[in-house]
């Protein structure tokens, strides 16, 4: 959360710094080109009509088109700045800073009280839910008993088998279940 707030502050500071740099550079360009200009939200830009009329006699068509493109970009930037300002004004972080009991009091009173629905269980609904639970329990018990009857027991070995370790082979090779006799 602290990182998010810090990042937002850095972005705002950089945006203000860029706006100041742009406005100072555009004001200097306005003094070079004598023409009408507009100043809106501390951002300077020339209108397309004024720039086209003043530059038609002085500059080539390429320079005029570049200025028109720049003015359109400035308009787009202004629109983005306005949207950002609206968003920052609409989204207030005061709710994060208010105590919890004040937030709950404000949220409780939002709905009209006469239309409130009271969900209190009746005796009939309680008895039906108890019956359903008992049926489920009985079904589970029957299922468990059925499994115990139907699952066959694993057959036990008639003769116990001797475990063989293959890591330490014996001198005599023997089968674990067969009787071995030595012949010398």
Swiss-Prot record:
Compartment(s) where it occurs, according to its Swiss-Prot or TrEMBL record: Secreted
Record bears the keyword Translocase: no
InterPro entries per the UniProt record, alphabetical: Alpha-s2_casein
Keywords for this protein: Milk protein, Phosphoprotein, Secreted, Signal
UniProt KW Lyase keyword: no
Region span, Disordered: 49-68
Principal location: secreted
Tissue: Mammary gland-specific. Secreted in milk.
PTM-bearing positions, type Phosphoserine: 23-25, 37
Gene Ontology CC: extracellular region
N-terminal signal peptide: 1-15
Source organism superkingdom: Eukaryota
Biological function: Important role in the capacity of milk to transport calcium phosphate.
PANTHER family listed in its UniProt record: ALPHA-S2-CASEIN-LIKE A, ALPHA-S2-CASEIN-LIKE B
Similarity field: Belongs to the alpha-casein family.
Protein name, UniProt field: Alpha-S2-casein-like A
Organism lineage: Eukaryota, Metazoa, Chordata, Craniata, Vertebrata
């Amino acid at each position: 959360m602290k990182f998010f707030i810090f990042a937002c502050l850095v972005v705002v500071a950089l945006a203000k710094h860029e706006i100041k740099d742009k406005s100072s550079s555009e004001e200097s360009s306005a003094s070079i080109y004598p023409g009408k200009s507009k100043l809106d939200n501390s951002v300077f830009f020339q209108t397309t009509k004024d720039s086209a009329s003043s530059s038609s006699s002085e500059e080539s068509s390429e320079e005029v088109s570049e200025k028109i493109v720049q003015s359109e970009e400035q308009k787009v930037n202004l629109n983005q700045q306005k949207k950002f300002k609206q968003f920052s004004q609409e989204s207030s972080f005061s709710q994060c800073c208010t105590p919890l009991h004040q937030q709950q009091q404000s949220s409780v009173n939002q709905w009209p009280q006469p239309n409130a629905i009271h969900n209190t269980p009746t005796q009939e609904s309680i008895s039906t839910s108890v019956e359903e639970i008992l049926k489920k329990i009985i079904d589970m018990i029957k299922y468990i008993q059925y499994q115990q009857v139907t699952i066959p027991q694993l057959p036990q070995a008639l003769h116990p088998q001797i475990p063989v370790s293959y890591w330490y082979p014996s001198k005599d090779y023997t089968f674990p279940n067969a009787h071995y006799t030595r012949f010398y």
